[in-house]
Amino acid sequence: MTATTYIPKSVFIDTNVLIDHLQMRSGHENADQILALGKNHTIRLCLSALSMADIVYIMRKTIDEKNIKNTFNDWIRHFIILPVAEISISDACRSGNPDFEDAMQLSCAEMEFCHAIITRNKKHFEPYTDIPVFTPEEFLGKIVRNS
């Protein structure tokens, strides 16, 4: 029996997963693996410009400015950086999602027709979209690597 490989074409990665990677928080190994999948073009990895602004704000006291700029330049080369448009703000206002920032992230993912969302906070995404939502662990568990 052959295992079925689940590899969505386009995947949106939420800010909290990116911060796991940057701060090497618990679970960062999963975030690292997902970013590697994007860098080697196994998946088309998308993140929003809002995530990048949030990361600078959240990590401003713990990360060197040169290092974060180098990281962002690397991400720009390998990943799709989605703009936050007026429609994302309007969508977030109408969504009923209690987390405005996550509602804007979701709008970005939907406008890009992403096939999956990876976040550690599924409750701010799943009730508001038909896009499959995974934790990093769940997402990696869905991918069967052929050796």
Language model features: what each stretch is:
Residues 1-47, 60-67, 127, 140-147:
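Short, well-structured N-terminal submotif of metal-dependent ribonuclease cores
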Residues 6, 80-123:
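Active-site neighborhoods of divalent-metal-dependent phosphate/nucleic-acid chemistry enzymes
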Residues 10, 44, 81, 117, ...:
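A residue-level structural signature of the nucleotidyltransferase/glycosyltransferase Rossmann-like core
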Residues 17, 51, 88, 105, ...:
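Alpha-helix capping/helix-boundary segments
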Residues 32-35, 72, 105-106:
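Short amphipathic alpha-helical segments and helix-helix/interface helices
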Residues 66-89, 93-95, 125-147:
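Short acidic, glycine/proline-enriched helix-loop-strand junctions
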